[in-house]
Amino acid sequence: MLARRLAALLFLLAFALLASQLPAATPATTPPAVQAVEAIGITVGDMDRAVDFYSRVLFFETVSDVEIAGDEAERLQGVFGLRMRVVRMRLGDELIELTEYLTPRGRPVPPDSRSNDRWFQHIAIIVSDMDQAYLWLRRHKVRHLSPGPQRLPDWNPNAGGIQAFYFADPDGHPLEILQFPPDKGDSRWQQPGDRVFLGIDHTAIVVGDTGASLGFYRDALGMKVVGESENWGPEQERLNNVFGARLRITTLRAEAGPAIELLEYLTPRDGRPAPADVRANDLVHWQTLLTVREAPAAARAFMGSRFTFVSPGVVTVADARLGFREGFLIRDPDGHGLQLRAR
């Protein structure tokens, strides 16, 4: 009996010694929830007018045009009794998805909206020639949100030489045209060609606390921080049309698609929070469309968190015209909408 115990003890000691010599197991890397920023969704009040503007003024091309109703769409968007027309449009490699709610009609963009209000979101359209692009927009009588194009100063190493201008679409949604200098931006924006309006570099959203937003976009969604900057001065103030504007800017990217840019106004701090009762049919509602591998797994990452689900959970979509099989709508810490979709 004693001999057997000694043998067992020697075996355990030998096994422990062998295990200590083996390399530590490397934990499996969890893939990011988000594969791509697929498109930027915008709720519009009049689809025919919006399509005319984006195609005739900004050179987007229509990809699809469908009308949707029924229980699945209602649960997905959190709007009962809806009928919506959804139009996808492309500029370069990037997509926008315009949605008009034929019923129920939503509220307009507040006429006193400012660039530091936390419902602010825009798309940054890259242009090859700012002077030509601005002249074209003037010819089409777009509504200015900046007094004119601004060139950010060279003392700022992360933004110096960038030219940008804010304006509005017919519903009052903010838009930006932007031209990178040769040493900044993706190399594809510097390729020679005869087009002026090239594509969408990013969508920008105003946030109240960059740290809280990184907990959502970086930590929960798995997007990567690819750029940071702090911008201030008269050029930045006039671009945003906010006196005393000083911004902390953080850029995140998924594996594919446009970036998401977080804009935190360090000063002034008087930007208003998004109304708590915003619904998807209100014209201040944007929804950034994110492609995920598995919608249920992505949804579980948010269960029990302080992030707000608009959909009651993952919604299975039988209508193939929408281009995905399941998804859900959620709001980030500042109320910006994101729809996570699995194909």
Predicted regions and their residues:
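N-terminal secretory signal peptides that target proteins for export/translocation
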Residues: M1-R4
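Bacterial N-terminal signal peptides
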Residues: A7-S20
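Vicinal oxygen chelate
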Residues: A24-P32, I125, D131-L198, I205, ...
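Short, structured motif recognition centered on aromatic/hydrophobic residues
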Residues: V37, G41-V44, F60, V87-M89, ...
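Core segments of cupin and vicinal oxygen chelate
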Residues: T43-E94, Q132, R139, W155-A159, ...
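Extended intrinsically disordered, low-complexity coil regions enriched in Ser, Thr, Gly, Ala
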Residues: D48, D52-I68, T103-P104, P111-W119, ...
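Post-signal peptide N-terminal segment of secreted/secretory-pathway proteins
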Residues: L76-L82, V86-M89, D93-I96, E100, ...
